[in-house]
Amino acid sequence: MNADVRNKIISIVLGVIIIALGFWLYESITGPYQQVLIAQERTEQVRTRMISVKDALLYYQQQKGNFPPQEGGLDTLVAFLKTDSLAIANGDSMFVQRPPLKYSPDSLILSPIAPFTRFNYAVNDTSRPPLYELRDPDSDDRIRDLSRTTLLNASSWN
């Protein structure tokens, strides 16, 4: 094998190695950024779903005069949304979901991210005004507080 052929083969091999290392470098820089974007989108989906549950709880309170009881509260809310004529007719516009999610009373109380855990709901109906707390078990996000009336319908992420 003469020197010209050997140099040509080495040049081709080194070119392929440079392209492979360049691709690896690109992926090592953009990969973590893409994961951050995916995590942010999931967080926004969960928060939007929690805001929809808050809106449903406030609608329930407006119609019934109080919040659902603590025991079976979210199930009571789902049953109410399935039977209320306004919620049936306009539920998708009343409780807006972040695409690609769609409104469904059954899935409203579940986190949109796998493993689809139920939101935690607690109510303190002995205080005036009655207070509720809605919490995502997979994060620190919550809406409202059981002890402070100043956090009326406030979310923890704002």
Segments and roles (model prediction):
Residues 1-12:
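N-terminal positive-inside, membrane-proximal cytosolic segments immediately preceding the first
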Residues 2, 59-158:
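Low-complexity, acidic interaction segments enriched in glycine
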Residues 7, 24-25, 32, 47-49:
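Short, flexible segments with low predicted structural confidence
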Residues 10-27:
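Hydrophobic membrane-insertion alpha-helices, especially the h-region
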Residues 31-46:
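Aliphatic-rich helix starts adjacent to a transmembrane/signal segment
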Residues 43-64:
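N-terminal alpha-helical signal peptides/signal-anchor transmembrane segments
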